[in-house]
A protein has these predicted regions:
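Mature catalytic core of soluble alpha/beta enzymes
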Residues: 1-172
């Protein structure tokens, strides 16, 4: 988990993602960084851009606006329009030994990072022979049912339980 945080965290100083956002290029990215960003770009492509890992500039524009003027309502359209110019997943380049983003871009993998980490932990446990496991790192992923054969019951605090017998559930 620490290794994955060192690659994907938006909040950890020195993470690969933070270094990429600062320098606009990341040389020799880890396999995890490459796989997670490749997955993010695949989802962006399949969703027609509805999911976009380059959304961080737009997020930061909102955060900065509300921090400076908490009671002023929504940011003006010109603030949003300027931030939106940075949001375009098609400008992200994953090369043979580097990742590059536009000078105005900043990435976030928050939309898939927690699930990616949960899946990697579950994969590792499965490869080590575990057949009846529920991994819960904020996102849930099961490897098979309980030993009894019953499904794992997972739910949000206000929801009806959902049965997992070898699958995943993510909520926000």
């Amino acid at each position: 988990i620490e290794r994955l945080e060192d690659a994907l965290s938006l909040f950890r100083d020195g993470s690969e993602l933070r270094r990429l956002n600062r320098a606009k290029v990341l040389h020799s990215p880890s396999g995890d960084m490459r796989r997670a960003l490749t997955l993010a770009l695949d989802i962006a492509s399949r969703s027609g851009g509805l999911f976009d890992p380059s959304v961080q500039a737009l997020w930061e524009a909102h955060v900065d606006w509300f921090a400076a003027a908490p009671n002023a309502g929504l940011p003006p359209e010109e603030v949003i329009a300027k931030a939106r110019t940075a949001v375009d997943w098609r400008r992200i380049r994953i090369g043979h030994d580097s990742i590059r983003i536009g000078e105005d871009q900043r990435l976030s993998l928050n939309g898939l990072g927690q699930g990616y980490v949960t899946d990697r932990v579950a994969d590792l446990l499965y490869l080590r022979g575990f057949k009846h496991v529920l991994v819960d790192l904020g996102e849930q992923r099961s490897i098979g049912p309980r030993r009894s054969g019953a499904p794992w019951l997972v739910a949000r605090a206000d929801a009806v339980p959902f049965a997992l017998r070898g699958g995943a559930l993510a909520t926000s």
